[in-house]
Every structure is written in structure tokens, then in C-alpha cells.
Swiss-Prot record:
Species assigned in the record: Haemophilus influenzae (strain PittEE)
Main subcellular localisation: cytoplasm
Entry keyword annotation includes Cytoplasm: yes
This protein's name: Aspartate--tRNA ligase
GO biological process: aspartyl-tRNA aminoacylation
Annotated region described as Aspartate, given as residue ranges: 196-199
Alphabetized HAMAP family for the sequence: Asp_tRNA_synth_type1 (MF_00044)
EC number annotated for this UniProt entry: 6.1.1.12
NCBIfam families: aspS_bact (TIGR00459), PRK00476.1 (NF001750)
Function summary: Catalyzes the attachment of L-aspartate to tRNA(Asp) in a two-step reaction: L-aspartate is first activated by ATP to form Asp-AMP and then transferred to the acceptor end of tRNA(Asp).
């Protein structure tokens, strides 16, 4: 037998037992007559002692070095009282080695487990990086999450059904990864961006509760929390309303947090998209941050200051304030830095006012814009934002979207910089009632979620007549400023689906070409259905406390969508390309 116990599982209950351990040398210390090693496996670390009592094992241990793969047979003994290590889970015990077997020696590592390694080093030698205890713990947590999800889904009547990986390209927002067909030369499969249409078809097939933990692929520009291939917890239901779907999924996530880290998330508040954007400048607000954005256009619409009065009198403009309690200590240099920061989001500037004495009216205000205000306007502003002595007010004034984006980003930055965001808290919520459509860069209407989302309380005729007023029957789950899951009630009426396609500029010929199978299926007694998908990678990222999604994926890609370890993507064999009837054009 190669192993009877895991290293990290040993404790006082094992004292006196003979054990067989297999793992790696994490650290070695030679004290002359004694040799100690910290031995590591996926479960943790335990101290092993080589004593002259077992001379053969002691002699063999002299040749051990870090990362040798070994087997130890020995007895679990109590550590002397003065040698107990309270920082280790196994710190009350050690193993007295009786036999040592070296499975394999190790070259000097290109990584240093005790130092910060570059991201490139970690990804190139990922198989070594994954040996680090913190990385092993993250992947164990990921496995625990998927086990919990499967149990929950089974207990609630959901069926785990697989959907195809080789499918048809459909417009879902990002670019597809294409796979050429050898049999059907000149034609391509697409790797799925999500199982969206297949799970809807399963509802039409009568499988009223579906789930799948599934790989998805999107060829898009990457960020720290994005990967070209990622994993979704995909869910779809029939004959359930949006609140009923949210209730089931909230119970799942509530249970997941309790099971994984012992945290009770409580009841999730529900907030409309409009309220989230108005108060927090984001459709995924971080509620750990107490700062809020307050509209003041009605107060400043008549001031002699174009920066304020023009957007205040423009239906598409916005003037808003963030009050920072005790923020008057912020320096002019910091204010200049914040002004530069909001410029990233299109803001032309950042007005500010320090409240040195709230009882002194304008006399108690220090601000370059004070000269444009009068006592009545200042009093109304101070009351609206509940200004107090020692506060600072930051003003944003521009088009609605620019002001909202800039002030939302400033709110987050102020929360971090000033230590206002309560990092030890968990703040979940549901955001609902998103706009059905938004304008793209060319000014055309695009689906805010996807073209299969149902509008709320709109007929096809009403939708076609006034699409920009439509509210989507959609919902996102947000935790600490991260969208961890999103979904909607789906369109189940063929007339409504064709109407949405037309609004999006997809004519009847394109509808048949791209979605003919869906439009046909909708004709045969389609049930009302709704669902959502969670990002497993992002959930794991939150539950393990890392800010980089690559830390919770065993073999991730870089931000350039490359694998440094295997050197993928690579050039294809010319013969394979010939069989696929593909000719590669070299870029200049």
C-alpha cells in the first residue's frame, strides 16, 4: 500500500498509529544527529523526524532535497510541548520515520515556493505552481463547490444533461471559436459561448429542470476575471416565474457560502437596474461601500455655471454628487489624481467642495465653484446629501452615461483608497428590470442580455412600436461588486421572438438561416421557461479570496489567450490544413 493517510489529516487522534504517507519534501532541516522534513501532499503538511533509532531511514534522508517525491512509513507521535506549532493543522504531532522510499528525485525548481514568482513563471511551470499549498487549497475548494451544486440540484429535481460542444455559430455577443469540418469542407462548427439555445430546446422537450456544469468559449479581449474558456453552472426551468427561479438559486448560493466558508449571507435584497445605476453608478454595485451617488440637477439647473446648468437642463444629462464623510482632509494633490481618474471614463473634470463649517453657509465652504452658488442653492445641496462639517463633496456633470460611469468608478476608488469599503463583509443582491435594449457604438439597438430574453409586460406590437422603453424580465445576482450569475425569463412565443430579431436588424432570411431550428421548435407547444447561469470560476474566486480568476483554474490561459506551458495555440500541420481545405494567409 502506497498510502494509508494524507499528511494534512494527521492529528492527536492518530498518536501511536503506524502510517504510510506519500508526497513531496516541502522543506528539510539537518540538525546533526536528527533530520526533520516537512512532508506535503494535496491535503497539507506534516513534520517527519528521522532519528538514529532507525538508522537506515536516517542515512537515506541525508540525500533528500526539496520536491523529492517520497514515501514514509512510520509512527505518529506527539510533539514535545515546547515544539507544538499552532500555525500548522498538524502542529501537535509528527511522524517518526521507520522507512524511507524515494520515488523520484527532483531537479532544482525554476520556481521558489517561498518567494513571489512572476505570472509568466507560474503559468509556464503550472504543474509545479499547483503544488503550492494555497493553489491546492483553491482547487480543493472548487471541487467542493461543484460537489455541493450537484447535490443541491439533485435534491431539487434538476437533471444533469449534456449539450453539444460542436455546434452552430449564433450571434451571442462575442466572437466564436471556429472548428473546421474535414467531412464538410469549407464549413465550420463553433464552440458554444453558452448552451443557451440547447437548454431552451430541452425545456421544449419536456425536461422542466435542467442543469449542467459546462465549458463555454468566447473569443474576446481578456481581463483579470475573464478567460477564453470558462465554466458555467448552467440552469433552466419550465413553469416557474422569475421570483421562483431567483428563490431556488438564492437558496443554492446561500447554502454554498455556508457549506464552503461558514458564512450566512442572509436574505438577498432586490434592486432595479435604474436604482442601482442612480445610487451606485453600476449594474453590479458593491454594497460594502457606504458611499452613494445623489442627483442634484433640479437644484443647480439655474446656477450661472455652464458645467452644471447645461447637463442639468438636458434630458440626457446628469448632475450628481458623492459625499465623502470626513473627506475634507483629502489633499489638493489627491483631488487632482481623482480628476485624472474620472477622465478615463470620459468626464471633463471633477468639481469639489470641502465643508469646513456646515453652520456657516457658503462662508464655511472651500471650493473653486463656491462663487457660482448662492446661499439658497448651497443649503439645498447640503440638505440633499446630508453634508456635515469635515465632509467633501465631489460633483459629476455631463451626459447621463458619462456621469454615471465616472461617478460609479470614483465611488469604488474612494471606498478603496479611504478604507471605507468593508472588506470583511459579504453583500449579495439581485439586480432586476434591466433595459431590454441598448445602443451599440454605431447607434444600433442591441440586446442588453441576449436576443432570447423576454420583455416584461410588453406585447410584440408594443415592443416594435417603442423598443427603447421595454424592460427585460432579466435578473443578475451580484456579490461584493461581482456579477456571479445572470439570467432571464425566455421568449416562448414565436411572434415575440421574430419581433425581437427584427428590432435587432436580423431580417427573415437571416432568422431562418441562423435560428430556423429555434423558430420551428417554438411552434410546437413551447412552455414558459426561465433560467440563468453562474460563473463557476468567479464563484470560486470569491470564495477563495483571490482577485485573479487564473488562480482558481488548473491550467488557465494568459491575457493573450495563450498557454505558456504547452505553447498553445501553435501552427497546424500543413497536411492537416490541406485535408481541411484551409489555406493560411501570413500577416505582413
Amino acid at each position: 500500500m502506497m498510502r494509508t493517510h494524507y499528511c494534512g489529516a494527521l492529528n492527536r487522534n492518530n498518536i501511536g498509529q503506524d502510517v504510510t504517507l506519500s508526497g513531496w519534501v516541502h522543506r528539510r532541516r539537518d540538525l546533526g544527529g536528527l533530520i526533520f522534513i516537512d512532508m506535503r501532499d494535496r491535503d497539507g503538511i506534516v513534520q517527519v523526524c528521522f532519528d538514529p533509532k532507525y538508522q537506515d531511514a536516517l542515512t537515506a534522508a541525508a540525500g533528500l532535497r526539496n520536491e523529492f517525491c517520497i514515501q514514509i512509513k512510520g509512527e505518529v507521535i506527539a510533539r514535545p510541548e515546547n515544539q507544538i506549532n499552532k500555525n500548522m493543522a498538524t502542529g501537535e504531532v509528527e511522524v517518526l520515520a521507520k522507512e524511507l522510499r524515494v520515488y523520484n528525485a527532483s531537479d532544482v525548481l525554476p520556481l521558489d515556493f517561498n518567494q513571489n514568482n512572476t505570472e509568466e513563471q507560474r503559468l509556464k511551470y503550472r504543474y509545479l505552481d499547483l503544488r503550492r499549498p494555497e493553489m491546492a487549497q483553491r482547487l480543493k475548494t472548487r471541487a467542493k463547490i461543484t460537489s455541493f451544486v450537484r447535490r443541491f440540484m439533485d435534491d431539487n429535481g434538476f437533471l444533469d444533461i449534456e449539450t453539444p460542444m460542436l455546434t452552430k455559430a449564433t450571434p451571442e455577443g462575442a466572437r466564436d471559436y471556429l472548428v473546421p469540418s474535414r467531412v464538410h469542407k469549407g464549413k465550420f462548427y463553433a464552440l458554444p459561448q453558452s448552451p443557451q439555445l440547447f437548454k431552451q430546446l430541452l425545456m421544449m422537450s419536456g425536461f422542466d429542470r435542467y442543469y449542467q456544469i459546462v465549458k463555454c468559449f468566447r473569443d474576446e479581449d481578456l481581463r483579470a476575471d475573464r478567460q477564453p474558456e470558462f465554466t458555467q453552472i448552467d440552469v433552466e426551468t419550465s413553469f416557474l416565474t422569475a421570483p421562483e427561479v431567483r428563490e431556488i438559486m438564492e437558496r443554492m448560493v446561500h447554502g454554498l457560502w455556508l457549506d464552503t466558508i461558514g458564512v450566512d449571507l442572509g436574505k438577498f435584497p432586490v434592486m432595479t437596474w435604474q436604482e442601482a445605476m442612480r445610487r451606485f453608478g453600476s449594474d453590479k454595485p458593491d454594497l460594502r461601500n457606504p458611499l452613494e451617488i445623489v442627483d442634484v440637477a433640479d437644484i443647480v439647473k439655474d446656477v450661472e455655471f455652464k458645467v452644471f446648468n447645461e447637463p442639468a437642463n438636458n434630458p440626457n444629462g446628469r448632475v450628481a454628487v458623492i459625499r465623502v464623510p470626513n473627506g475634507a482632509e483629502i489633499t489638493r494633490k489627491q483631488i487632482d489624481e481623482y480628476t485624472q481618474f474620472v477622465g478615463i471614463y470620459g468626464a471633463k473634470g471633477l468639481a469639489w467642495a470641502k465643508v469646513n463649517d456646515i453652520n456657516a453657509g457658503l462662508e464655511g465652504v472651500q471650493s473653486p465653484i463656491a462663487k457660482f452658488l448662492n446661499e439658497e442653492v448651497w443649503k439645498a445641496l447640503a440638505e440633499r446629501v446630508n453634508a456635515q462639517t469635515g465632509d467633501i463633496l465631489f460633483f459629476g456633470a455631463d451626459k447621463w452615461q458619462t456621469t454615471t460611469d465616472a461617478m460609479g468608478a470614483l465611488r469604488l476608488k474612494l471606498g478603496r483608497d479611504l478604507g471605507l469599503t468593508r472588506l470583511d463583509e459579504w453583500k449579495p443582491l439581485w439586480v432586476i428590470d434591466f433595459p431590454m435594449f441598448e445602443r451599440d457604438e454605431e447607434g444600433n439597438l442591441a440586446a442588453m442580455h441576449h436576443p432570447f430574453t423576454s420583455p416584461k409586460d410588453f406585447s410584440p406590437e408594443q415592443l416594435e412600436a417603442d423598443p427603447t422603453s421595454a424592460v427585460a424580465n432579466a435578473y443578475d445576482m451580484v456579490i461584493n461588486g461581482y456579477e456571479v450569475g445572470g439570467g432571464s425569463v425566455r421568449i416562448f412565443d414565436p411572434k415575440m421572438q421574430q419581433t425581437v430579431f427584427r428590432i435587432l436588424g436580423i431580417d427573415e432570411e437571416q432568422q431562418r438561416e441562423k435560428f430556423g431550428f429555434l423558430l420551428d421548435a417554438l411552434k410546437f407547444g413551447t412552455p414558459p421557461h426561465a433560467g440563468l447561469a453562474f460563473g463557476l470560476d468567479r464563484l470560486t474566486m470569491l470564495l477563495t479570496g483571490t482577485e485573479n480568476i487564473r488562480d482558481v483554474i488548473a491550467f488557465p490561459k494568459t491575457t493573450a489567450a495563450a498557454c505558456l506551458m504547452t505553447e498553445a495555440p501553435s501552427f497546424a500541420n500543413p497536411q492537416a490544413l490541406e485535408e481541411l481545405a484551409i489555406q493560411v494567409t501570413k500577416s505582413e
